[in-house]
From Swiss-Prot:
Family membership: Belongs to the ARR family. Type-A subfamily.
Species for this entry: Oryza sativa subsp. japonica (Rice)
A biological-process GO annotation: phosphorelay signal transduction system
Role description: Functions as a response regulator involved in His-to-Asp phosphorelay signal transduction system. Phosphorylation of the Asp residue in the receiver domain activates the ability of the protein to promote the transcription of target genes. Type-A response regulators seem to act as negative regulators of the cytokinin signaling.
Protein name (record): Two-component response regulator ORR5
Annotated SUPFAM superfamilies: CheY-like
Length: 134
């Protein structure tokens, strides 16, 4: 089984991060930060699309997802990933513009790797990726 550090990394390539956010602006920001740090990025606009992509391409190094999204929240996406024997090793990071300790704790208890507050800063992503993926 691939580890979180090797999962989604092609030989000699960069880690593959799945960015999930219903806001096109936030999706572009997080994708830009990740790409500037030399990560391969696939960006989708919903938890449902993330699960569809993971069904056809499970080789993702990490998932960074917004908490509040229509159809499926980031928390619901986290639960589905962690319940899947095929996907549960993928680190999931939740992002939110709301600093609500009960929500943060619930996500961490459910298996989230970390919780980032928006607006996400390049230093936050750099710290996170170096800890989780390198």
């Amino acid at each position: 089984m691939a580890t979180c550090r090797s999962r989604g990394v092609e030989r000699g390539g960069a880690p593959h991060v799945l960015a999930v956010d219903d806001s096109s602006v936030d999706r572009a920001v997080i994708s830009g930060i990740l790409r500037s740090s030399q990560f391969r990025v696939t960006a989708v606009d919903s938890g449902k699309r993330a699960l569809e992509l993971l069904g056809s391409e499970p080789n993702v190094s990490m998932i960074i997802t917004d908490y509040w999204m229509p159809e499926m929240t980031g928390y619901e996406l986290l639960k589905k990933v962690k319940e899947s024997s095929r996907l549960k090793e993928i680190p999931v990071v939740i992002m939110s513009s709301e600093n609500v300790s009960t929500r943060i704790n619930r996500c961490l208890e459910e298996g989230a790797e970390d919780f980032l507050l928006k607006p996400v800063q390049p230093s936050d992503v750099s710290r996170l990726c170096s800890r989780v993926l390198r």
